[in-house]
């Protein structure tokens, strides 16, 4: 089942993001190329966070576990929501 990952920025997350953005983007690219990340990106106002859509909860959890934005405090909170896609 597809899973949506929601990231919320830490209070000081934007100030930390630039130091880790290249590693974070490389991780996104790797998961996309593996076919387990369908799309991802920040909201129009990056301070509001970001989302990613994964093919499974396990893939999302694997991504989060070692994401530089999570391990370095850019992301303050995250949550996963399993999603029943209707239109394909």
Predicted regions and their residues:
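Conserved, structured core segments of small domains
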Residues: 1-88
